């Protein structure tokens, strides 16, 4: 028998990563990380694109086989962090390129139940790729290489990426960039990050991609403008507060030193004490007495208030809660809605800072080219107008303000209630009733003719008016009566 040829380590690891047992998959994932670290450290080492595609094939099905949500999240984070096992930027980009190629190739075969975990995997891989750029100090060359890789593999018309991959990538890009670098990135660096999207929006012929870029990138920037300005004001306040605190500490230290020196000098000059010192002592004692009295009064008031509050709490505990009728639900008032809105704004994640005037000028330069389609130019001009308004200090308003929208809803509800309450229309005036009676009492000539015909028919038929005879019944009856009379006359003659 011919001895079996050993398979390459990439294929062996890929087979184990796609195994049925979770223990086997976890062990293969740990071995894969060690293998990547060991091979990438060699001067002649490194992976070919085909080898990385085989590795990602196994990682894809490793994620496919994981069903539990918490373990899916942990596995996705572990897979995404493999990018840091490569020691060179070129190797990292090759690894990321193989990932996006694998997702584009396998996207059609993902069913509805497994879609969410691959959405999560895409988000985590994008986040870790941005963290890799952050680890190198947000180098301009590193940023350009990463953006070129992403736009070429995902948003380029020749990439053949499905619309689901494109739309999800555009939805999560700004969010993940803000999470990773909102505290460090400047407005110029943020403009560099979104410049590829500006270029694609100006030249793309795919209306869906254009719409998604405008909604997920530019519209998000416009909507987050108030939060970005608020962050700037908070930073300025904290900086001014820290400066005042440092100045106050220096002033207190100098004042304390001066006070101690003056007290020592006064004590050495006059040990017996002057009248001023005595007066100050008396005034201090008077202040202390007044303070004691006021504190005593305040204590009594506090005791009374505490007793009242305890009684009120007891009453609230004694009163049973009101039961709502079946089918009703608790509805929060407008104040609760406002508080919820404020909480949402406060809980909003980090926000990126942008130079709105510079972004508007960049978009205008791209949109005003002759090669830009007219449809793209119109939509980009609207975005440019909003950005220039932001640069001028005016925030965009909603099409329908919240108060007006609430009034519209209330008006519709009131109209519906009124319609339900209104009774059926009935004659309210006596004149209307008399007119109706007169109209019924004086029928028209056509109705009189119909009534005359009916009365003539009834009179001709005879018999009770309720019974009707078939046509020709009278003639048949008359013909049947004559033979009976003849029979009776013949019998009498005999």
From Swiss-Prot:
The modification Phosphothreonine is found at residue 455. Its main location: nucleus. It comes from Mus musculus. One of its GO terms (biological process) is rRNA processing. Keywords: Nucleus, Phosphoprotein, rRNA processing. Residues 244-304 have a biased composition (Acidic residues). Residues 332-341, 401-413 have a biased composition (Basic and acidic residues). Residues 414-423 have a biased composition (Basic residues). Interacts with C1QBP. Interacts with RRP1B. One of its GO terms (cellular component) is nucleolus. The modification Phosphoserine is found at residues 254, 434. Residues 239-349, 388-494 are annotated as: Disordered. Belongs to the RRP1 family. It is found in: Nucleus, Nucleolus. Plays a critical role in the generation of 28S rRNA. This is Ribosomal RNA processing protein 1 homolog A.
């Amino acid at each position: 028998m011919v001895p079996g040829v050993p398979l390459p380590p990439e294929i062996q690891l890929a087979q184990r990563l796609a195994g049925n047992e979770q223990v086997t998959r976890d062990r293969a994932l740990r071995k894969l990380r060690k293998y990547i670290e060991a091979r990438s450290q060699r001067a002649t080492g490194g992976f070919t694109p085909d080898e990385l595609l085989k590795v990602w094939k196994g990682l894809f099905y490793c994620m496919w086989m994981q069903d539990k949500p918490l373990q899916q999240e942990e596995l996705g984070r572990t897979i995404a962090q493999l990018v840091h096992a490569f020691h060179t930027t070129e190797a990292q980009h090759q690894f990321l390129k193989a990932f996006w190629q694998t997702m584009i190739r396998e996207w059609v075969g993902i069913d509805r139940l497994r879609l969410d975990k691959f959405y999560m995997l895409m988000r985590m891989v994008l986040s870790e790729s941005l963290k890799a750029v952050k680890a190198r100090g947000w180098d301009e060359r590193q940023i350009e290489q990463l953006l070129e890789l992403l736009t070429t593999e995902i948003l380029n018309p020749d990439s053949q990426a499905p619309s689901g991959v494109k739309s999800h990538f555009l939805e999560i890009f700004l969010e993940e960039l803000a999470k990773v670098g909102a505290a460090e990135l400047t407005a110029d660096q943020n403009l560099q990050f979104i410049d590829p999207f500006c270029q694609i929006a100006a030249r793309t012929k795919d209306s869906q991609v254009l719409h998604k870029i405008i909604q997920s990138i530019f519209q998000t920037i416009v909507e987050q403008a108030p939060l970005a300005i608020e962050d700037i004001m908070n930073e300025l306040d904290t900086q001014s507060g820290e400066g005042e605190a440092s100045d106050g500490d220096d002033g207190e230290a100098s004042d304390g030193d001066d006070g101690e020196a003056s007290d020592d000098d006064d004590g050495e000059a006059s040990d017996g004490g002057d009248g001023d010192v005595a007066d100050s002592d008396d005034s201090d004692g008077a202040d202390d007495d007044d303070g004691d009295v006021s504190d005593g009064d305040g204590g009594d008031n506090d005791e009374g208030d505490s007793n009242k509050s305890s009684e009120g709490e007891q009453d609230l505990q004694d009163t049973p809660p009101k039961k709502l009728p079946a089918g009703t639900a608790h509805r929060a008032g407008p104040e609760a809605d406002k508080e919820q809105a404020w909480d949402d704004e406060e809980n909003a994640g980090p926000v990126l800072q942008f130079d709105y005037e510079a972004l508007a000028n960049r978009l205008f330069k791209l949109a005003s080219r002759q090669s830009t389609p007219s449809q793209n130019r119109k939509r980009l001009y609207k975005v440019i107008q909003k950005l220039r308004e932001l640069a001028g200090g005016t925030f965009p308003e909603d099409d329908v303000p919240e108060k007006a929208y609430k009034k519209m809803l209330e008006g519709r509800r009131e109209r519906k209630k009124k319609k339900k309450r209104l009774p059926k229309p009935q004659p309210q005036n006596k004149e209307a009733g008399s007119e109706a009676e007169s109209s019924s009492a004086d029928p028209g000539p056509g109705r009189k003719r119909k009534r005359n015909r009916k009365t003539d028919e009834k009179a001709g038929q005879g018999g009770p008016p309720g019974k009707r005879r078939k046509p020709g019944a009278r003639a048949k009856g008359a013909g049947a009566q004559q033979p009976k009379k003849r029979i009776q006359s013949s019998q009498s003659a005999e």
